[in-house]
């Protein structure tokens, strides 16, 4: 489990090689902290009525509030508060009886007010947990990740640096700022220190963010698309000497944008910090950036402490005091959460952990479940959504759930195959027709003339012609070379353009040749 040697710089100023992962673990225990930002799927921003449509023309979804023009006052989006409470409940958090917003002061071009409205010492949700499972050689192992807090805040604008390396400001010719994103509602979920992950620290970090993503998706409060920035993760890593009660200095790797990258970033930081310490250096508290191309982190700026932001209560916003009856109503409306659904479906459908996770990763659990409810066997429903339909969704750039085909229609296609009316090849053509808006599966079958030729009289005539046209293959079959029947079946399928029942065609061929197969 060693690592290629790379170099970085320690506090002593020299280049430092990475320390092999296993060697680091012999002397140190990794301590993790994960801060996850989730863009909520509300129709308007956190403190104004501007739209939140992703991909709109730059600076077209802005107003005096999100541009911080003098005299513009914020108003809290109640839908965002509701989403925050629902997530807090799903994460087993306590919901504060009283919370308030604070100003987080810093200067950066993407923050027009020169402060961000956030929550500091009085968050809306606190003291929860999320259970995650990691596959190990000894079998699945469960970890309970403590949740320190879930708090509300507003997003920043988006800065783009043109002409620099890797989109960084260094060497850029110029920079642009799009304020469409400024003010979009964010939830920040902060874990308690994760000290018991040990050698599985990278996998635990990945499993936590994956489970959190699935949970948020089930709640329907965000699309949690990491590639679009609606789910962003900051990874804090430090090393604690084995047997010590004192933590080491932590680094924060910002905005890691995929599950795989989260795992790689944690592993690299453990190896990098181990190398720094083994060389006699000290780890610098700083912000770092993950480089996807190399799988490494690079130094950014020194890491601020809370006092650097000069938090103080926002005088323009009144405190939020969620009504207890409202909170309980929200608790009662929570959907079946992913962990409970996985346990149920795994037992009902007899799935392996990998098969189940494939469904989760494709966001296909609900679609498959609805297809099964419409009458399809679980294995067939899973096959269609994960294979053919997933490919079509990828080709058209949409989510599976956005494809113009319903679970009931998929179930009908499966039924037509099972009853022998369609082959798998013909079934794919039927699905193409449904996706093209040609109607229900049965209507597509009739309009395209796709039903399997299974009538013995019609099929028998085609079989006789195939035998006559392929005398050599027929003779081989008569002489006991049963494999040669494939050529005759192929001839039948070509003649019928794939619409023959291949199994029945094979049976008729063998009968006519006087061979048992």
Swiss-Prot record:
**Which SMART domains does the annotation name?**
GatB_Yqey
Q: Which UniProt keywords apply?
A: ATP-binding, Ligase, Nucleotide-binding, Protein biosynthesis
ATP-binding listed as a keyword? yes
One Gene Ontology term of the molecular function aspect: ATP binding
The record lists the catalysed reaction(s) as:
L-glutamyl-tRNA(Gln) + L-glutamine + ATP + H2O = L-glutaminyl-tRNA(Gln) + L-glutamate + ADP + phosphate + H(+); L-aspartyl-tRNA(Asn) + L-glutamine + ATP + H2O = L-asparaginyl-tRNA(Asn) + L-glutamate + ADP + phosphate + 2 H(+)
Tell me yes or no: is Ligase among this UniProt entry's keywords.
yes
- Alphabetized Gene3D superfamilies for the sequence: 1.10.10.410
Q: Which Pfam families match?
A: GatB_N, GatB_Yqey
User: What's any GO biological process attached to this entry?
Assistant: translation
Q: Spell out the InterPro entries in the cross-references.
A: Asn/Gln-tRNA_amidoTrfase_suB/E, Asn/Gln-tRNA_Trfase_suB/E_cat, Asn/Gln_amidotransferase, Asn/Gln_tRNA_amidoTrase-B-like, GatB, GatB_Yqey_C_2, Gln-tRNA_amidoTrfase_suB_CS, Gln_synth/guanido_kin_cat_dom
Family membership: Belongs to the GatB/GatE family. GatB subfamily.
NCBIfam families referenced in this protein's UniProt entry, alphabetically: gatB, PRK05477.1-2, PRK05477.1-3, PRK05477.1-4
The protein's job, in short, is: Allows the formation of correctly charged Asn-tRNA(Asn) or Gln-tRNA(Gln) through the transamidation of misacylated Asp-tRNA(Asn) or Glu-tRNA(Gln) in organisms which lack either or both of asparaginyl-tRNA or glutaminyl-tRNA synthetases. The reaction takes place in the presence of glutamine and ATP through an activated phospho-Asp-tRNA(Asn) or phospho-Glu-tRNA(Gln).
| UniProt xrefs under PANTHER family | GLUTAMYL-TRNA GLN AMIDOTRANSFERASE SUBUNIT B MITOCHONDRIAL AND PROKARYOTIC PET112-RELATED, GLUTAMYL-TRNA(GLN) AMIDOTRANSFERASE SUBUNIT B, MITOCHONDRIAL
Task: Fetch the HAMAP family from UniProt.
Answer: GatB
UniProt subunit comment: Heterotrimer of A, B and C subunits.
Q: Which protein are we looking at?
A: Aspartyl/glutamyl-tRNA(Asn/Gln) amidotransferase subunit B
Gene responsible for this protein: gatB
């Amino acid at each position: 489990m060693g690592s290629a040697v790379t170099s970085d710089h320690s506090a002593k100023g020299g280049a430092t090689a990475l320390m092999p992962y296993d060697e680091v673990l012999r002397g140190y225990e990794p301590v993790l902290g994960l801060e996850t930002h989730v863009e909520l799927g509300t129709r308007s921003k956190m403190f104004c009525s501007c739209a939140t449509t992703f991909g709109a023309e730059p600076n077209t979804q802005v107003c005096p509030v999100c541009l911080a023009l003098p005299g513009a006052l914020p108003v809290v989006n109640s839908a965002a508060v509701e989403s925050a409470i629902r997530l807090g409940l799903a994460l087993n958090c306590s919901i504060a009886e009283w919370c308030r917003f604070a100003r987080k002061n810093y200067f950066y071009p993407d923050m027009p007010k020169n402060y961000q409205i956030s929550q500091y010492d009085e968050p809306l949700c606190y003291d929860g947990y999320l259970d995650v499972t990691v596959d190990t050689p000894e079998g699945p192992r469960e970890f309970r990740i403590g949740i320190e807090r879930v708090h509300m805040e507003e997003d920043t604008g988006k800065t783009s640096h043109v002409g620099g390396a890797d989109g960084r400001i260094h060497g850029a010719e110029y920079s642009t700022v799009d304020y469409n994103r400024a003010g979009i509602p964010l939830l920040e979920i902060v874990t308690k220190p994760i000290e018991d992950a040990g050698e599985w620290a990278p996998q635990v970090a990945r499993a936590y963010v994956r489970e959190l993503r699935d949970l948020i998706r089930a709640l329907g409060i965000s699309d949690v698309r990491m590639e679009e920035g609606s789910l962003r993760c900051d990874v804090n890593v430090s090393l604690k000497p084995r047997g010590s009660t004192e933590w080491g200095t932590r680094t924060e790797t910002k905005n890691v944008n995929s599950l795989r990258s989260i795992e790689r970033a944690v592993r690299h930081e453990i190896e990098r910090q181990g190398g720094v310490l083994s060389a006699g250096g000290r780890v610098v508290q700083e912000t770092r950036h993950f480089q996807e191309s190399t799988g490494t982190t690079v130094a950014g700026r020194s890491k601020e402490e809370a006092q650097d932001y000069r938090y103080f209560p926002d005088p323009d916003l009144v405190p939020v005091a969620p009504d207890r009856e409202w909170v309980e109503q929200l608790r009662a409306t929570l959907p079946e959460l992913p962990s409970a659904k996985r346990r149920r479906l795994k037992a009902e459908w007899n799935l392996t952990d990998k098969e189940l996770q494939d469904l989760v990763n494709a966001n296909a659990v609900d679609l498959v479940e609805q297809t099964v409810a419409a009458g399809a066997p679980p294995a067939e429903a899973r096959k269609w959504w994960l294979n053919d339909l997933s490919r079509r969704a990828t080709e058209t750039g949409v989510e599976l759930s956005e494809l113009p085909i319903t679970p009931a229609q998929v179930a009908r296609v499966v039924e037509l195959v099972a009853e022998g009316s369609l082959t798998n090849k013909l079934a794919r053509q039927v699905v193409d027709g449904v996706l093209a808006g040609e109607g229900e599966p049965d209507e597509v079958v009739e309009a395209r003339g796709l039903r399997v030729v299974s009538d013995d009289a019609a099929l028998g005539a085609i079989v006789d012609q195939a035998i006559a046209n392929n005398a050599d293959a027929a003779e081989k079959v008569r002489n006991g070379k049963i494999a040669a029947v494939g050529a005759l079946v192929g001839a039948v399928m070509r003649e019928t353009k794939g619409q023959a029942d291949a199994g029945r065609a094979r049976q008729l061929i063998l009968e006519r040749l006087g061979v048992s197969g």
